[in-house]
Regions:
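Surface-exposed beta-strand edges and their flanking turn/coil or helix-capping segments
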Residues: 16-18, 156-158, 173-175, 244-247, ...
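Solvent-exposed amphipathic alpha-helical surface segments
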Residues: 37, 249-253, 379
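Short, well-structured beta-strand/strand-turn elements
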Residues: 141-143, 252, 328-332
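Beta-lactam-recognizing serine transpeptidase/beta-lactamase-like catalytic domain environment
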Residues: 208-225, 234, 238, 259-310, ...
Length: 454
């Protein structure tokens, strides 16, 4: 699904006894050898570079009075430097070599002991050759190999493959404790979402270990090793076809009548014998500024976005009736509207008359499920009267649903998964709603597990 593309990068790590003056010299030299995007250079970078180049002259511009606080005590060196930087004129700033100033900034941002990235994209052969051949005289400049992800199938399944932090980002703040406890460095590139995060420990490989000698010389102690590959159960051709079909269908559906509240669909294709996920996709419809609809990927919602399942759960609901002797196989019940005091009528989509369990499932009778739920809850139903049920009725249903994978973790190997919403109400009306899939919520992945179990 993806490849690692090796890329050459230039970095700088300040060596012992290297002065600011020497770094200025290096910045000028390197700026003539490397092509770097200098568009991010700022006024403060230019002032800093001018200050370092003319430090004595600029510091002399700060008067004795400006060097003292109101109480007569001497200001800190940092405060004095801030004043000195304001003494640099705009003409002097405009005279600064922008390329050298930006290189100097890259050499000195962050901690002095840290390795700084100078260039990591579009490195030319002659640039790489120059740095490599002159490492001994470039006082801290070096070359090394980095990598970037190449996705062989574009955006297909990309959101579930996940992301890796950039070389500039390193370990994100919210994941720092997790990774630092595992021995990572703050500037390491790490998996930060979905499969990249889930399998980081297998994908990361092993760093080379060096022994640091005098003058920051290095000797190799042990070589690094590449990380492992992981093999997914996803059938990529099926995945591509699924995404194409779903993209087309959600857009077509949105243009149909009575779809004001519709904006997304999910599909999971799995092997019910093994539980393997063969393809999965979620697509969401959005409206652009031009008023036209467009489709975006929403596949993570398969495990993170619980939905009200509706009638699909009636198969599990009818098993509750069998288990707790509310009905037997073939039991016939009258499909007619039910009325609980102070609540609206509860009906099926049409009145079906006297029906058995098979007919009730085939034609999605709500009332058949309502009457099962009343019996499971030991209720005494009378038209338009209050209805009380036993406290354990909900737990009987939830226990059965859980055996099918609803309301419990599916075990999918992704770092985030919602359990869905489990209602707290004990009202009889809500139990009836529950029995037809209109109360608790479940993720599309849980529903896929439910269907596979059946």
């Amino acid at each position: 699904y993806l490849l690692l593309l090796a890329t050459n990068i230039f970095n700088y790590k300040k060596e012992k006894d290297v002065t600011s003056e020497r770094e200025v010299e290096l910045a000028y030299l390197i700026s003539t050898k490397l092509e770097i995007d200098y568009s991010k250079v700022t006024d403060s970078m230019l002032r800093e570079f001018f200050y370092i180049e003319h430090i004595d002259d600029v510091n002399e511009r700060v008067s004795d009075k400006e060097r003292k606080n109101e109480n007569g005590r001497k200001k800190s060196l940092d405060d004095i430097k801030k004043i000195a930087l304001t003494k640099i004129s705009d003409e002097e700033v405009s005279s600064v070599n922008k390329e050298a100033a930006y290189i100097y900034y890259l050499m000195n941002k962050g901690y002095s002991y840290a390795e700084k990235i100078i260039k990591n994209k579009d490195v030319k052969e002659e640039e790489y050759a120059y740095i490599s051949e002159n490492i001994d005289s470039l006082s801290g400049f070096n070359t090394k190999l980095d990598w970037e992800r190449i996705y062989l199938y574009g955006d297909t399944f990309k959101s579930i493959l996940g992301n890796v932090s950039s070389d500039k980002q390193g370990i994100p703040k919210e994941l720092a404790n997790h990774y630092l406890e595992l021995g990572y460095s703050l500037d390491d590139r790490v998996g930060i979402s979905y499969l990249e995060y889930q399998y980081e420990n297998y994908l990361k490989g092993t760093k080379a270990i060096y022994k640091v000698g005098d003058n920051n010389t290095y000797s190799l102690v042990s070589e690094g090793k590449r990380g492992n590959d992981i093999v997914l159960t996803i059938d990529i051709e099926l995945q591509k076809r699924l995404e194409s079909i779903l993209t087309e269908e959600v857009l077509n559906t949105k243009y149909e009548a009575n779809t004001g509240y519709y904006n997304r669909s999910f599909v999971v294709v799995s092997n019910p014998q093994t539980g393997e996920i063969l393809a999965m996709s979620g697509k969401q419809v959005r409206k652009g500024d031009d008023g036209k609809y467009y489709v975006v990927d929403y596949t993570p919602g398969i495990v993170t976005l619980p939905v009200t399942p509706g009638s699909v759960v009636k198969g599990a609901s009818i098993l509750v009736g069998y288990k707790y002797n509310a009905i037997d196989i073939g039991t016939k019940l009258m499909d007619e509207c039910i009325k609980i005091k102070n609540t609206p009528l509860k009906c099926s989509w049409r009145t079906m008359g006297l029906i058995d369990d098979v007919y009730a499932l085939a034609y999605s009778s709500n009332v058949y499920q309502y009457k099962i739920a009343i019996k499971v809850g030991n209720g005494n139903y009378q038209y338009d009267k209050p209805l009380k049920i036993s406290d354990d009725a909900f737990s009987k249903y939830r226990s059965m649903y859980a055996s099918f994978g609803l309301g419990v973790k599916t075990g999918i190997d992704l770092p985030v998964e919602s359990l869905g919403y489990s209602g707290k109400s004990k009202l009889s009306g809500h139990l009836l709603d529950y029995a037809i899939g209109q109360y608790d919520t479940y993720t599309p992945m849980q529903l896929s597990q439910y269907i596979s179990t059946i």
